[in-house]
Structure formats: structure tokens, C-alpha cells
Amino acid sequence: MSGELVFVPLGGVGEIGMNVYLYGIDDQWIMVDLGLTFADDRLPGADLVLPDLSFIEERRDRLLGIIITHAHEDHIGAVPYLWSKLGVPIHCTRFPAAVLRRKLSENGVQQASAIREMTPGEPFDLGPFRCCLMHVTHSIPDANALAIDTPFGRVLHTGDWKLDPAPMVGERTDIEGLESFGRDGVLALVADSTNVMSPGTSGSEAEVRDSLKSLIREQKGCVVLTTFASNIARLETAMLAGHEAGRSVVVVGRSMHRMIDAAKESGFLENMPPVLDERDVGQTPREKLMYLVTGSQGEPRAALMRIAFGNHPRIRLEPGDTAIFSSKIIPGNERTLYNLHNQLVERGVEVITEEDHFVHVSGHPCRDEIEQMYRWMRPKIAVPVHGEVRHLYAHARLAERLGVDTAPVIRNGDMLRLAPGPVSVTGEVTTGRLVLETTELVDAGDDLYRTRRRLMSHGTIQIVLVLDSFGSLLTSPRITPVGAVELDTFTENADEITERISDAIEELSDREVLDDDRVELTVRTGLRQAMGLPKFKRPIIDVQIIRLSPDALDAGADKKKGAA
């Protein structure tokens, strides 16, 4: 035995989303998950946000493989965009493999052969790491915890999990396997923190199935139900509920079709009733229709957003219809979703969420389930992941109350030594966020996004100056504010503002007026003063200086004479 066993999160710590974790021994590495997250108001105009893999890209020849715990976007979504930077085998079970093959193909990545399909419970070796995927229940089929044997001891990486005694799709959590792995205690438990602040248990999908069937039977008009496209059990529940209520079920949204196809390929959804294509609805009465649509988080291009705003080519909602949100609001999406709810209500649609009716159970463990996992594993070290900072600290406090020796709360980029010796952060590696702009990856800290945020908050003012070769103004400055000031107020004072800018330029010396930088600074300062902009108002001021030579002026004059 030599070296150290270290754990390095590149994403997924201090946040919910973008999970990507590294385990290393002697500079040999395995990666667990490679997910993305979705942009918020801090990245205007952006959609997908991916992790910066610079640290491991520089060591790609020492990266032994990627292990995927399950097929949620925050765990696999970055693979189609970043796998080519790594080029190593991807190890996962059947359903994640089916989803990944489709995602890689859709993104033009012809490397599906890189996927190694693993069987839960069967160990495989990657250098000094003996790995075994162990089935756990989650809100998606074929989810797994990762059991890792190392020369320094055992580590259990839980992934996303819960204890559901009656899962509707897929198998129960492999309690026997977990108990066996933790029988002698483990070195470290790296565990899901999402619901650590919620007492009790997370509930069973079977209970939601009964509730949704009853709810859909009661509805009179057209029903639109949205949920996470990857929640295969919920999709099956919704389809069965609609079918039993005498409704034709219509599936709308590319990601939902992709997930259903992958589930069928993997042997799930055997009880799925027949569904209609949205183009084949024909003369089916509205009260006999149920649309199963994407967009449970208010995604701008998803089906529900287009339906709510009347932009969908085939689906229209009317007063008396019902929209059921069979999902939880992901933190950060509240404002977008409330706006979506309001838009639906304005159309006369009844909106039903988990606050109104029992339509959702979480796919993550609540406190009682987390405590049970600690009893099975009896870890020396607890490393909280998959949660915001408040979740991580609550998880660490819980672990300490349960007798764990140490429960460090770390940040993305921290290199945490797990063994040998005392647990400590021994260094920090490069982390960050990349934004997918069309087909290009842009650093989230780029000026592009600072400029967009400033434009959103403060607007812009464009000034065009036309000067002759001596620096004299040939025309009055043309000033165009966009979103920076109230337009009527500006119009009332435009002549005075223009005059003050002209005066400021004329006060420059003969030498200064020939220096574009000096002219631009003078105009910026003068404009702020002339418009009375407060210090906190910082519009982007774009000064365009056009200098015309005598030849250009003569040519312009000749052209005017010719036209006359």
C-alpha cells in the first residue's frame, strides 16, 4: 500500500445538480457520474451548464473509467458534450446505457462502443479500485450505489437513492448487499444530502399511483400532466391512470419519448397501455384526452411552456381543463414555475401541485432512511454531497450525532484525503462552470455573461460622434438609450443632454480631441452627469467615433451636388 486515497468533487457539492466526483490513489483516478445543471438568472441567455474538467483532462491518461450511477441529467447529462475530452470507458447498468446510447447518437457522438454494460452486484476492477454497482430505488429505474474496495478500506458512494418497499418500476434497494458490504464497517460513506432536513421517510410510489388514479378520474375537461421525463414509474402511473379513467393518453416531448423507448428496450414499462401520437388525436373529445408532457420545471423549450403560452401547434387548453404537476420544484426554479402556473390559471386552467394534492413523492431519502444507511455502513468518515450548503451542514451534524468520527463539509474542488492519516483537505483543484452556447463551450465567468447581466439590469446607451480630421463635430451627437432610462424623460431633455456632450468635446485641447480614448472617456463622464445617472446605475455606454477625412467630406459634398 502506498500513496493516499483522495476524494475530489468537481461538481455536486454545495449545489443540487452537475454531479461529477473523482476518487484517486497514486494519481490513478475513477470518475463517478458526469452531469449537468440548468442555467438560472445569473447566466442570461444560457441553457445548459457543464462542469469544468480541466483538472482531470490534464490527467486523462490516468483516468481509468467513468462510472454512472443512474440516468438523471444531473448525473449523465454532460457525457455527450464532454466525453470526447476524456475518451475512457463508461461503466453503467442497462437502463443508463440505453439512455446514453440515444443521447450520444442525438449529439453526433459515434462512440457508443465506449459504454460497458455492467450487472448490479458483480464486481469489476479499475486499477486499485474494485467496484460494484448495487441496486437502489430512486425516481428512475436501474439506479445504483457504488461500492468501492480500496487498499485503504471500503467506500460507499450512495448516488441518489431511497427506501421504497413497493417500487412500481424496477427492483427494491439491495438491502442484503448493502448490509453485507457494511458488515465490518466502512472507511467512508459519501452520501446524498437532499432531504436530510425532512423528518420521516420519503414515501412510496405505490401510494402516489392510487392517489393519481383517483384524481384523474374526477376531472371533467382535458387533463395535462407533467412530471420528470426520467421518472419511468410516474409515467407508467400516469398512463395507467388515464387509461383506467377512459382517456386516450398522448405523450408529448422528445425527452419523454426518448426515456420511454429506453425503458422499453431495458425491459421496463411492460404494463404500459397504448398511447396516441399527438398528430393522431383527430376528433377525440377533449374530456377523453390526457396529455403527458415535458416541462415540469418550466423549461423554456419544453412542451408545457409552449402549451401554456398558446404556442404549441396542436394542443390548446381551455377553461375547465386541468394541469397536474406531478413533481417537486427544484430549488431555483420557483419564479419560472409560478409564472407558468399563473399563465395557465389566466387561461382558466385549474393547476394542481403537490401543495394541493398527493401527486408526488421524493426520490431521495428522508432523515429516517439516511439514519438506516448509517446503521448499515457504520462509517468512520461521512462526506455529505448532493445538496446545498445548508443540506451539507445538516447532514454533517446528523452523522456526528450518529457517532461518525468525522464529517467534513467540503466544496467543489477540494482534494479531501480519506486515508491514511487524519482526514483533511490537502489541496484545491481547478473547478468551474462551462456554458453551452450553440455548439461552443464558454466559461461561465466570461465577459459575455457579465455583459448580459449588466444589460439586463442597467441597459445600454449608444452614442455616435462624427468628427472631422481636426476633431470638430460635424453633426450633433446621436444618443440612443435602450433600457437605461425612461424614454419620455430622455426625449424631453435630449437637446440639453446633446448640447452638454458637444460642449464637453469642444473643451478638449487640440491634442486631446484627436485621441479616441480621451474623447470616449470625456463623453462617458459627461453623459452620466448630463443624464443625472445615480452611482448604482451602470448602463453600458457604447461610444462610436467616426472620423471623416477631408477627401471623404469632399466626396460627400460632390455626391450631394450631383443629386441636386
Where do the PLM segments sit?
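Hard-cation-handling environments
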Residues: 197-326, 330-355, 359-512, 520-521, ...
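His/Asp/Glu-rich metal-coordinating catalytic cores
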Residues: 1-67, 72-283, 302-316, 335-338
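A glycine- and charged-residue-rich anion-binding loop/surface
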Residues: 13, 37-41, 45, 62-63, ...
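Short, well-ordered strand-loop elements centered on a beta-strand within folded domains, enriched
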Residues: 7, 30-31, 157, 249, ...
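Conserved hydrophobic residues forming the short capping helix/wall of the S-adenosyl-L-methionine
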Residues: 104, 399, 531
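C-terminal tails and terminal domains of large nucleic-acid-associated
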Residues: 512-549
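Short glycine-rich phosphate-binding loop at a beta-alpha junction
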Residues: 89, 383, 542-543
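RNA-binding accessory domains that recognize and position tRNA/RNA substrates
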Residues: 1-6, 486, 516, 520
